[in-house]
Structure formats: C-alpha cells, structure tokens
Amino acid sequence: MDVYPDSALLLLEQIPHPEKLRGKQRADYVLLLTQARDKNYLDSMQSDSLIKLAVDYYKNGGDNVKAGKALFYYGKVMDLQGNDTLAMQAYLNALAKLEKTEEYKLQGLAYEYIGILNADRKLHKDALDNYQSSVYCFQKAADTLGVIYAYRDIARIYYVEQKYDSVYNY
C-alpha cells in the first residue's frame, strides 16, 4: 500500500461484488479502499459512508491498530468535508486507540493533522506541541520524511509568531 498505492487501488477495485462482503471482511475492504484512495489523492475520499462502516465495526473490537487507522481516515474525510470539529475528534480518538501500539508513523500523522487543525484555529502553542509530538513519533518510526515535514510545520509556526531565530533552527 505504501510503495504501490495505485496497484493496491486497482486490485481492490477488481474485487467482484464488494457489497456482498460482511463483517470483518467488509470492514477490512473499506478501510483498505479508503487508504488506497487517500494515497492516490482521489476526491472520492470525500464520502464518509464507506469509512464509517470500518469505524463502526472496529470501535468495540480488540484490534486497536485497525480501529485507530479507521478513525484516522474518518478524520481525513471529515477534514475534506470541512467539518473540523469531527475531524479533530476522530484524530484524538485515533490517538487514544493507537497509544498502546507501535504504529508510530500513524501516531505521527495523527499529531500532524491535529497540529494543522490547531494552526488553522490560530492555536499556535497547541499546534507546536502537536508537531513536536509528531517529530517524536516519526523518529520512533524511523520515518525521515515524516520528521522533515514535522520540522517544516514547526518552522512555519515560529515564522507566523515572528520568532525568526527559531525558524532557522528548523
């Protein structure tokens, strides 16, 4: 999925009659399909009906990784729809599910998106804290690109606050 998201999407779309899938298979399918659409930057991710199936299925189950991932993508869909409040709640719920897992990259992404929402609300201190948490998670995941993006986000906050000396550190 991370390396060849276009191939993953193609394979998922070739599954005959996905509407006949039930239970875990259906939840896994819609979670993977939403993830593939996101990684391919498709506008079709703006519909929340599919990912909501996965959120509802995993919310009471024992798979915190899939529950966290479903909540994260639900947050992204809500963000695309302009519903910042539901997006924030979904990201926070995703972090709550993921906190006892080793899904550090996904945790880092959740912190980053929370930071973006906070920055949009002019809550710069909160956004800075979120971005710093994101750096920590990306470092634990050995995700160099994630660390770079998080540092960029930190620098932007310092720039907006006109703390130019701090901008140069990042």
Feature roles, as predicted:
Residues 1-170:
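A "functional boundary" signal
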